[in-house]
Amino acid sequence: MVAEGDPGNLVRTIHLLVLSASWGMQCWTTFVAGFVLIRGVPRHTFGLVQSKLFPFYNHIVLCCSFISLAIYAAYHPRELLSPSESVQITLFFVCLLAAALHARWFSPVTTKTMFKMHIIEREHSLGQGVGLSANREAYQRLQEKDPKYKALRQRFMRYHGISSLCNLLCLLCNGANLVYMALLMPTL
């Protein structure tokens, strides 16, 4: 099923649109939407919004990563890859792997843990402050006096950190692949 050679204008256009749409969505979600939202709505509302949007976001990135890798692999047989093409296909594969782990494992665990934390926080009248620094002392006291909450917070931070790293890895891989594609364009 390898289709070595010129993919044609339609396939090239689809490949570029999928990759650039994914990268643009990643940039917006990573560097704009979250920061604006956390500064503008209560903490639990922020978590609820993210719990609704992120599954779609994560699976769209996963689908785009799969399509990008599939198109690239179809027109670049492994036996004929140049060193730069080997790097590019590796970036597509790493992005797909990170997107899959993010969408199917790390993000859902982060969300489930967050909702468990919300239950405890509501019992202590927390979660309605706007911004990450709202009621910081109250959250600290809650961690100190409630070992279950402290354990949940540690789990949340661990999975949120790994989830964020997967997201950044995808963003960097897609950005690098866009640079590769731009450098190969004969003209604008």
Swiss-Prot record:
It is a multi-pass membrane protein. Pfam families: DUF4149. InterPro entries: TMEM205, TMEM205-like. It is found in: Membrane. Signal peptide: none annotated. One of its GO terms (cellular component) is membrane. The chain crosses the membrane at residues 18-38, 53-73, 89-109, 168-188. Keywords: Membrane, Transmembrane, Transmembrane helix. The keyword Glycoprotein does not apply. It comes from the Eukaryota. The keyword Ribosomal protein does not apply. Its main location: membrane. Belongs to the TMEM205 family. This is Transmembrane protein 205. The gene is tmem205.
